[in-house]
Regions:
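Short, surface-exposed, low-complexity cationic segments
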Residues: 66-89
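Cofactor-binding catalytic cores of oxidoreductases
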Residues: 13, 23, 44, 58, ...
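Short acidic, Pro/Gly- and aromatic-enriched capping/linker segments at domain boundaries
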Residues: 39-57
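Short, solvent-exposed polar/charged micro-motifs at secondary-structure junctions
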Residues: 29-35, 51-53, 76, 125-128
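Short, low-complexity, polar/charged sequence segments that are solvent-exposed and flexible
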Residues: 38-44, 75-76, 83-85, 134-138, ...
Length: 193
């Protein structure tokens, strides 16, 4: 039974020979391979700006900073500086099938493994475009304009998902973190809206 079949049978509760797993860096113990599109419209690599500080711009235009050369960093300046920017901001174009060549290559190189592609979704993209504190404030103060932004992010995600599937992905993983250990970051009533 191939890794791809093991994962499929796990998902379908169809008597797999074992539990599917993914221990990164240990090829004999891995059923998954990961890949993503090659769109890098506004992205720059990390650049050292002083002795301990590094900065980069992601493909959305957000400026990131990190301490040392090994931390993940955080957004220090979102691409959107004003709420009305939601109407004019140009998202990276994830609709071009040619940008999904890395996914097709992964499928060709690993035909017997489960090809998983992770993408950021509404909250992850939106909170970085404004920075988290400003984003949460805009959810309360400018709900209709935030719906405009969320619809645009969702359209971009739809393009990604469609192209990932056409390029050979078996699954698309979306991880959103709307909460702390014991509660939502926003009022539950706002969440429902």
């Amino acid at each position: 039974m191939t890794s791809r079949e093991i994962v499929r049978r796990n998902l379908e509760f169809d008597n797999p020979e074992r539990v599917a797993y993914n221990l990164f860096g240990y090829d004999p113990y891995r059923d998954f391979v990961n890949a993503g599109p090659g769109v890098q419209t506004k992205a720059t690599p990390w650049q050292q700006v002083d002795e301990n500080t590094w900065e980069k711009t992601d493909h959305y235009g957000n400026v990131w900073r990190r301490v040392e050369d090994h931390s993940a960093g955080e957004v220090i300046r979102g691409a959107l500086q004003d709420i009305d920017d939601v109407y004019t901001y140009e998202f990276p174009d994830f609709s071009n099938p040619e940008d999904y060549a890395p996914v097709r290559k992964a499928r060709e190189e690993h035909p017997d493994m489960w090809l998983n592609c992770g993408i950021p979704f509404t909250f992850t993209v939106s909170r970085k475009l404004f920075k988290l504190d400003v984003y949460l404030m805009q959810l309360v103060l400018n709900r209709e304009k935030m719906r405009v932004l969320h619809d645009k992010v969702d359209k971009m995600a739809e393009d990604k998902i469609r192209n990932l599937a056409e390029a050979g992905a078996d699954s698309v993983m979306i991880a959103e973190d709307w909460g702390t250990q014991d509660r939502l970051l926003i009022n539950p009533e706002t969440w429902r809206q």
